[in-house]
């Protein structure tokens, strides 16, 4: 009897091994086939993506199988592409060629890290959840823009090891910006940081309209139209600022002025992080642990009004930050910890929408206003790479001249050899 049971057990083990191996082989073959298909179709641009989506329509559940999801991300060059269905160029020259053929302007994202990886900078991750999957935004982008992204530099990552097998992985510091370029690659406008979905769509529609108008002109007329546009935007921001504060009972609002941040001070990850609320909520605990609060941030342009007033301003734009059903479905698919209960998930979503609304008003009234001013002055705005250098140095406070992104504070003693800094011999020799 024991021998019979042993034979049966051994038989079940062999059968399990056989079926597991067969399943593994089938999954590997499927992955290889889908990968090859994605590589081939990517060469066809957005048409290739449409072909893939049509041929795999029955596989595009929410979320799809890991194999289909990975293939789509490779084809689109965007993480969670199954939710947005957007095709991105990673070569600006190819994007410009597509723009000239289609007559569409370019939306060029600059970010820390890569858009097709999970751990890109925080704002770009929020774009992938709140903006790109939004049904209205994704359709508008698909129909009216050529999409492109480019890495500014690798995103800093932090791993907290609890010593028992548990780890907490996060990115830290950095910001992102969308540039609107004409089909020759010249900057028309820029949308700095995170905006709520409705506010972002409004920006896209405004910039697409001026891009269309500019495409019909050249020379001095082009220059005049672009300056008139930015002058109107500046006036509109100032008028809206007064109207919003008046609605809050502030009859003599402070004037929006040039960015008063002291650029001679050493770069600070704490100060840079304070510019983007959504990402600072995630990163602040880690930054506070790494970098003691010793710097004077009184010159921060955000101090033009107090935090309580910023919060009240954000409440006026709460509806502009509402997530649509596609974005909420993507959040649910990501299986966040401690959000199995529907009430907990709703709370997470409400909190996210609240900080998005705050980001929206601060980015528009402080950062975008400054960008309009630069365009009006023709201050490093004719070349997207030069403009991007200026934005990251003077608006985002993460200049390319600082390899440590404000995280290495030479004025604070931490009792670690070499301050805990480990340099790459290759980067040191540059």
Predicted regions and their residues:
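Boundary at the C-terminal end of the N-terminal hydrophobic targeting segment
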Residues: 22-25
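Thioredoxin-like thiol-disulfide oxidoreductase module
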Residues: 89-101, 126-189, 197, 202-207, ...
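Aromatic- and acidic-residue-enriched segments that line the glycan-binding/catalytic groove
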Residues: 120-125
């Amino acid at each position: 009897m024991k021998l019979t049971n042993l034979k049966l057990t051994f038989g079940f083990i062999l059968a399990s091994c056989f079926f597991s191996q067969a399943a593994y082989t089938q999954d590997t073959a499927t992955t290889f086939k889908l990968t090859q298909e994605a590589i081939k179709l990517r060469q066809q641009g957005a048409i290739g993506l449409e072909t893939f989506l049509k041929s795999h329509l029955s596989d595009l559940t929410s979320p799809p199988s890991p194999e289909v999801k990975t293939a789509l991300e490779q084809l689109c060059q965007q993480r969670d592409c199954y939710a947005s269905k957007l095709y991105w160029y990673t070569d600006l020259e190819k994007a410009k060629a597509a723009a000239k053929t289609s007559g569409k302007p370019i939306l060029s994202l600059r970010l820390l890290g890569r858009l097709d990886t999970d751990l890109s900078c925080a704002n770009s991750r929020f774009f992938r959840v709140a903006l790109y999957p939004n049904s209205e935004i994704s359709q508008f982008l698909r129909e009216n823009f050529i999409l492109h992204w480019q890495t500014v530099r690798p995103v800093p990552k932090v791993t907290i090891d609890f010593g028992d097998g548990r780890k907490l992985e996060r990115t830290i510091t950095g910001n992102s910006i969308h540039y609107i370029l004409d089909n020759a690659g010249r900057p028309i406008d820029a949308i700095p940081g995170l905006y709520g979905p409705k506010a972002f769509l409004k920006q896209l529609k405004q910039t697409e309209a001026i891009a269309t108008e500019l495409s019909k002109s050249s020379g001095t007329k082009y220059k005049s139209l672009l300056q008139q546009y930015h002058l109107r935007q500046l006036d509109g921001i100032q008028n809206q600022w007064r109207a919003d504060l008046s609605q809050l009972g502030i009859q003599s609002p402070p004037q929006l002025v040039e960015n008063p941040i002291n650029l001679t001070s050493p770069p600070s990850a704490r100060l840079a992080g304070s510019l983007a609320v959504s990402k600072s909520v995630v990163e602040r605990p880690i930054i506070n642990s790494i970098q003691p609060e010793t710097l004077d941030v009184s010159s921060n342009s955000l101090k033009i009004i107090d935090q309580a007033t910023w919060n009240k301003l954000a409440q006026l734009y709460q509806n502009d930050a509402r997530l649509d059903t596609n974005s909420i479905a993507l959040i649910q698919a990501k299986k966040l910890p401690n959000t199995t209960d529907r009430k907990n998930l709703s709370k997470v979503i409400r909190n996210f929408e609240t900080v998005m609304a705050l980001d929206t008003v601060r980015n528009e009234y402080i950062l975008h206003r400054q960008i309009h001013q630069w365009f009006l002055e023709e201050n490093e705005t004719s070349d997207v790479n030069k403009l991007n250098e200026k934005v990251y140095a003077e608006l985002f406070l993460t200049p390319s001249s600082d390899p440590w992104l404000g995280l290495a504070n030479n004025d604070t003693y931490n009792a670690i050899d070499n301050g805990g800094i480990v340099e790459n011999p290759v980067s040191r020799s540059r």
